[in-house]
């Protein structure tokens, strides 16, 4: 594989520049004036006499036309200076060197190119120093990352601006306005996390927590049979362009290390991984050959690269495995099945559970967050809410306290496949046993009958559990259960889950959520077609669907669409009724009613009139 051809392939496929109808804007910090917090701004037609609409924007520098993108150099490491300025980190004098097993022993033309060495420094905590966002928060310190998050969450709303709180939040504590101090308090209590490895200098900080906007994650990554560096970097940029707040690299084939390096260096969103996948590649795919030393080495490798959160299946304990024997679909988590196989082969307790304190100490030195994996999640609605699932969940609650003791941030992973009437119980159990640590769920899928449409079956459950309190939703694409998603599948999954997350925010009564809906509703009623397109989650698709039947520019000002036509448009008729009422005398309605009443009496006061 030629490195220059690979770079060229990536550069030609990624999308840059703003989303149609939008522009990139920034807001500076007050505590940290050097901060530039990004937003997507959509200006509406002057006839609306309305201010622009501000939308949360995780797309990074790629949507800013003023920034020159060079994939080979990676994104600017603007956060690095903030991390170093705190004085709590030191450069690693002897960073870990890349080994053949890190890339699955790939050689020659099968070895993906390394990310070019650009002089990046690798850091870890100084002995005895605070370095995690949780430790800073507990010490009463507001970090630059915390102010950054507060600004992002407010969507440029002013603190004294009145807001409408129309929703049911099920006991959450969502404020009218997010302050840096509120962010600090939520982090200190463990109710939110800011996944932000000190070695991810390219990161634009974000928060995951019940009292913040619901976030979504997109999964990418190669497999043993498909995908390249170019494919995965392109998917990363594409996913964040359409709204992915974090991205997980779930690569399982060769070249895991090199592909991950390209992804992190070009990512402004937090990157998560499942380290056991790479550890398994290092032992040639034989689960029984896994051991603590290989896993520990993999953790350090990924910490130094800049991975922001790890999914670790430490809750798959030996006593729980027999509980899955009578399930319809058994153990469906890849990480869970790997650890279950190891436990049974050795008839020993899960070494991730037994070595959990040591794992915490490694992660603490780099501020890598836990995403405690649900290795026993249900893979079918028939298996939902069983004893295996909830036994693991209770264990994750115990491990949460251990991680917090070490100063490490934690979120909890959840199911899976759960019918609608069982979803609320999942949220209730998680809050009860996991001490309000953020919940991060895969859907859940609410039915098993729709291969090819599981982005829809899961978005139903995602919207519900997001409303109940889940902090982040892991997307599902149309290819779920069928194959590796391509570029189009990634976009479909992201858009579907942004919709579910926003629906949850709206239902919870998030103070800024309804502003977006109201803006597009007014545009729809006033037939401002361009505003309707531009304010949507996917302006390109909205415009395409409209133009398939009404393609002319004149149709962009028409007071109808192709569904109802000019005579039957309900909104056009409503406008005519409104205009008629506005043009009549104040008592015209009463006079009209009196006229009809007199006519009724003249006809004999009969409800039904006889025909001639």
Swiss-Prot record:
One of its GO terms (cellular component) is cytosol. It is an enzyme of class 4 (lyase). Zn(2+) binds at residues 417, 481. It comes from the Bacteria. Signal peptide: none annotated. One of its GO terms (biological process) is thiamine biosynthetic process. Binds 1 [4Fe-4S] cluster per subunit. The cluster is coordinated with 3 cysteines and an exchangeable S-adenosyl-L-methionine. Substrate binds at residues 219, 248, 277, 313, 333-335, 374-377, 413, 440. Pathway: Cofactor biosynthesis; thiamine diphosphate biosynthesis. GO terms for molecular function: 4 iron, 4 sulfur cluster binding; phosphomethylpyrimidine synthase activity; zinc ion binding. Its cofactor is [4Fe-4S] cluster. The keyword Mitochondrion does not apply. [4Fe-4S] cluster binds at residues 561, 564, 569. Belongs to the ThiC family. Homodimer. PANTHER family: PHOSPHOMETHYLPYRIMIDINE SYNTHASE, CHLOROPLASTIC, THIAMINE BIOSYNTHESIS PROTEIN THIC. NCBIfam families: PRK09284.1, PRK13352.1, thiC. This is Phosphomethylpyrimidine synthase. It comes from Caulobacter vibrioides (strain ATCC 19089 / CIP 103742 / CB 15) (Caulobacter crescentus).
């Amino acid at each position: 594989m030629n490195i220059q051809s690979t770079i060229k392939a990536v550069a030609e496929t990624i999308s840059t520049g703003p989303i149609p109808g939008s522009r990139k804007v920034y807001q500076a910090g007050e505590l940290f004036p050097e901060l530039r917090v990004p937003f997507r701004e959509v200006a509406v037609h002057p006839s609306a006499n309305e201010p622009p609409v501000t939308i949360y924007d995780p797309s990074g520098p790629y949507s800013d036309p003023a920034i020159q993108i060079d994939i080979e150099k990676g994104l600017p490491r603007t956060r690095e200076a903030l991390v170093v300025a705190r004085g709590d980190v030191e450069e690693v004098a002897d960073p870990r060197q890349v080994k053949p097993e890190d890339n699955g022993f790939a050689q020659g033309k099968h070895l993906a190119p390394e990310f070019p060495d650009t002089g990046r420094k690798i850091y870890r905590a100084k002995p005895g120093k605070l370095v995690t966002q949780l430790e800073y928060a507990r010490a009463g310190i507001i970090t630059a990352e915390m102010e950054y998050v507060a600004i992002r969450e407010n969507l440029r709303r002013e603190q004294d601006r009145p807001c409408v709180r129309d929703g049911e939040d099920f006991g959450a504590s969502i404020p009218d306005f997010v302050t840096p101090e509120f962010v600090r308090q939520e982090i200190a209590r463990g109710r939110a996390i800011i996944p932000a490895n000190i070695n991810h200098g390219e990161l634009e900080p974000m928060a995951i927590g019940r009292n913040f906007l619901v976030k979504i994650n997109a999964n990418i990554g190669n497999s043993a049979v498909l995908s390249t560096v170019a494919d995965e970097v392109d998917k990363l940029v594409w996913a964040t362009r359409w709204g992915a707040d974090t991205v997980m690299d779930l690569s399982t084939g060769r070249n895991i290390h090199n592909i991950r390096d390209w992804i992190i260096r070009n990512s402004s969103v937090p990157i998560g991984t499942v380290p056991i996948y790479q550890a398994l590649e290092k032992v040639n795919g034989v689960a029984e050959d896994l051991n603590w030393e290989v896993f520990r080495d993999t953790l350090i490798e990924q910490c130094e690269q800049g991975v922001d959160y790890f999914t670790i299946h430490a809750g798959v304990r030996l006593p729980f495995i027999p509980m899955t024997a009578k399930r319809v679909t058994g153990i469906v988590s890849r990480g869970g099945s790997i650890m279950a196989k190891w436990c049974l082969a050795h008839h020993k307790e899960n070494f991730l559970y037994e070595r959990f304190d040591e794992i915490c100490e490694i992660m603490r030195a780099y501020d890598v967050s836990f995403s405690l994996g649900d290795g026993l999640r249900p893979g079918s609605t028939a298996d939902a809410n069983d004893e295996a699932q909830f036994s693991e969940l209770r264990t994750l609650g115990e491990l949460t306290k251990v991680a917090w003791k070490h100063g490490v941030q934690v979120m909890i992973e959840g199911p899976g496949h759960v019918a609608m009437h069982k979803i609320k119980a999942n949220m209730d159990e998680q809050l009860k046993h996991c001490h309000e640590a953020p919940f991060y769920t895969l859907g859940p899928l609410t039915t098993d009958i729709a291969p090819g449409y599981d982005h829809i079956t899961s978005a139903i459950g995602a919207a519900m559990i997001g409303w109940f309190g889940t902090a982040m939703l892991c997307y599902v694409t149309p290819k779920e259960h069928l194959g590796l998603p391509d570029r189009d599948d990634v976009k479909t999954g992201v858009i579907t889950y942004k919709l579910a997350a926003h629906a949850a925010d709206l239902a919870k009564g998030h103070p800024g959520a309804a502003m977006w809906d109201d803006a597009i509703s007014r545009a729809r009623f006033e037939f401002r077609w361009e505003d309707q397109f531009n304010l949507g989650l996917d302006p390109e698709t909205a415009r395409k669907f409209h133009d398939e039947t009404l393609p002319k520019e004149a149709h962009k000002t028409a007071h109808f669409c192709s569904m109802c036509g000019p005579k039957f448009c309900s909104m056009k008729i409503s406008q005519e009724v409104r205009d008629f009422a506005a043009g009549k005398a104040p008592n015209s309605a009463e006079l009209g009613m009196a006229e009809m009443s007199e006519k009724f009496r003249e006809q004999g006061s009969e409800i039904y009139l006889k025909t001639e």
